């Protein structure tokens, strides 16, 4: 499916979807905890490497994700349904307040790793560019597959990574201003947006597999 490259609404929707999936503000306490023992310069390096890795992972998903599905014989509509279910499960954990606890558990399993290793694993993947963000990116790439659309979606990915970088750079100040309560509220709002996106993915996939079912 191709659209006019001047239709900004689809790129805004893609950007909001990524932000809702990853919730950069909700990730701030995790980033602060994981880099607590790093110096100022080390923390900056971790932030840069992590978000560069996020861009690379999502770009690979954008341009080659559908080809990978074809290799394994997975239809895009089945993948849309599976991705939608995954996104809804993440949304449930965000709304119920379990999302941060889940991430902390993953972080705790990596505590014994060297500081230099946390930029890519587990920070870039799976905490930022996790299964939800990757599957969402692949789905968008199949919706709008012209080179012009993919190029603009690439710019959205770079913008998203830049926003994550900004959030992590401002982490100490954001924690002071919002506190845990403010961050939890934002996480729940993102969860509601995310659930809507997941339902849309599922309904589109079901509608394509079973034409007329949703009409």
Curated annotation (Swiss-Prot):
One GO cellular-component annotation of the UniProt record comes to: plasma membrane
Q: List the membrane topology term(s).
A: Multi-pass membrane protein
Question: Keywords assigned by UniProt?
Answer: Cell membrane, Membrane, Transmembrane, Transmembrane helix
Pfam families in alphabetical order: MarC
Compartments (UniProt record): Cell membrane
Please list every transmembrane segment annotated in the UniProt record, as residue ranges. Answer: 14-34, 56-76, 81-101, 120-140, 150-170, 189-209
Superkingdom of the organism of origin: Bacteria
Q: Which family does it belong to?
A: Belongs to the UPF0056 (MarC) family.
NCBIfam families annotated for this entry? Answer: NAAT family transporter (TIGR00427), PRK11111.1 (NF008320)
Could you identify this protein by its name? UPF0056 membrane protein BU267
């Amino acid at each position: 499916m191709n659209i006019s490259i001047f239709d900004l609404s689809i790129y805004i929707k893609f950007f909001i979807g990524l932000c809702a999936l990853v919730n950069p503000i909700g990730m701030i306490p995790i980033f602060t905890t994981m880099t607590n023992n790093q110096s100022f310069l080390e923390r900056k390096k971790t932030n840069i490497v992590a978000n560069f890795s996020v861009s690379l992972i999502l770009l690979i998903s954008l341009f080659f994700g559908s080809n990978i599905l074809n290799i394994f014989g997975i239809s895009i509509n089945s993948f849309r349904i599976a991705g939608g279910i995954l996104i809804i499960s993440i949304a449930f954990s965000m709304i119920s307040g379990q999302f941060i606890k889940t991430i902390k558990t993953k972080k705790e399993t990596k505590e014994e790793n060297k500081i230099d290793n946390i930029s890519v694993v587990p920070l870039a993947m799976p905490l930022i560019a996790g299964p939800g963000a990757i599957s969402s990116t692949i789905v968008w790439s199949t919706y709008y597959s012209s080179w012009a659309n993919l190029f603009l979606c690439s710019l959205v990915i770079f913008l998203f990574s830049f926003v994550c970088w900004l959030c992590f750079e401002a982490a100490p100040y954001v924690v002071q201003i919002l506190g845990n309560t403010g961050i939890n509220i934002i996480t729940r709002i993102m969860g509601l947006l995310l659930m809507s996106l997941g339902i849309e993915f599922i309904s589109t996939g079901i509608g394509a597999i079973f034409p007329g079912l949703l009409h």
